[in-house]
Amino acid sequence: MTAAAVQIASQVMHADATLARIYAEAVRAAPADELVRAALLCHLAEPSTPAARLADDLCTSLDIVRAAYRACQGSAAVTRLVNSMYYPHRMRWSFATTTVQEWQRVPDRPERIRAHEPVLSETVEIHPTRGTCNYRCAMCLWSDQQELTYATKQLDTGGLMTAGGWIRLLGELRENGVHRLVISGGGEALINPELPSILTRAAELGFEIHVYTTGFSIRPGSPLFEALLRCHRVRFSIHSPEPITYDRIAGTRPGQHALDRVVGNLGALLCERDVLPTVGIGFVIQPFNYDQIAAMVDFAADTSADWLDLRKDEVGVTDGLTPDQLTVVRDQVRAIRRRPPVDTRIDIGDELVSIANGHSPDRSRTTECLGRYFRPTIGAYGHLTPCDLKAEPRFAQTGYDLGSVKRSQVLDVVAVSSQRRVADDCVQCMPSSRTGNRILHKLLDDLASGIRLDEQPFS
């Protein structure tokens, strides 16, 4: 066993006193074997490490790693740890669990991915927008609507997708095993007058529908409002609990009373829903609002939102936070973790958890981008891209355009592009894509090493 690997892992799992306590509870439930516990420690400290590499790092066997993985399966203590606001890889673990379940439902999927055969993910993001947004959020990919546009990036060929085109596409996606539809990006979808018919058809086809919106354009009682009530999750982007800061970030005018209007729409959805949709808030930390995190938690609880996503600007649109500002952020997140609200779930992104724990976030890359296998995206003009970031004008590059679904069936586009290798070398990469890439590479490497899906710790 190499002391260096264990020491590094121990630093991660003991970076915070509460994290260390929860981790200790997980270890107590594990076998007493020293090597198994070392493997468990290193795995929990970085769950995307392939089993063979973990065995090499510890100078041990795959059987020891398997034993550590078994210690995770069905362990209530491990479940408490990996679902904790103190665990820096909570979202990574959750993604791994979902992926293992998906691959177990479709057993040939890993082999098809490895062979670069056509594969359509169970989750697809679509951008049924008008190719624009009525906000100018400072940290958003749409903050620049002059130079970084579909036209300047040569993504506007053939015009926008029509409502009929989207509805045809929905049928193709459903027929080919897609069941989760994410409507996020490409501008603000809710200002597209055709969106109600698109959402209604998606609901009729049985999709699980997630919508991300500013919330400004919702009108209670309208066809759009009724369509949103048929969705599963609706997340409002609210980046300040204070009207002045909200307007400064969003680019809205004081006379619009935008924050009040958005909060009213959020409340109307909560009031009119049956069981679904769940309704939450997304808050992106940036120089304008870095000191408002605690106030935002109170705000979310006061609105009765089901959850609040706390994230950093993780693709560098705004200026980075200074060391002093990061200290303010860290102190607020630590205070929130000690006393979270009772009824509103606080979802802290992995990067923020690392910062609160006193560690630098992990932004390492892999050898190949596999984003097309877990969240491919279809942009407003019908271009299929490997991920949501490459469908946006700010980060789009024609080399990442996998084809158009406007004139071809989506599975044909996937098939034609399946042999194209996509390098994991983009200037920026969304945290969800970094997470997905790391986990897919781990699972594929593990299968090649003889670790079955039902042996994974995420099973």
Which positions does each model-derived feature cover?
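Processing junctions and N-termini across compartments
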Residues: H127, G131-N134, R363, R420-A423
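Flexible mid-to-C-terminal extensions adjoining Fe-S/redox cofactors in radical SAM and related proteins
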Residues: A3-A5, A9-V12, A26, A71, ...
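Radical SAM enzyme [4Fe-4S]-AdoMet core and its adjacent flexible, acidic
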Residues: T2-H14, T60-D63, R80, T152-D156, ...
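Small disulfide-bonded, cysteine-rich extracellular recognition modules and tandem repeats
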Residues: D57, C140-S143, I249, R372, ...
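Flexible loop residues that form catalytic
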Residues: Q145, G186, H239, D313, ...
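Conserved alpha-helical substructure of the radical SAM core
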Residues: D57, T79, N83-R233, D319, ...
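Flexible, acidic/Gly-rich N-terminal and inter-domain linker regions that tether
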Residues: M1-T123, Y135-M139, D425, C429
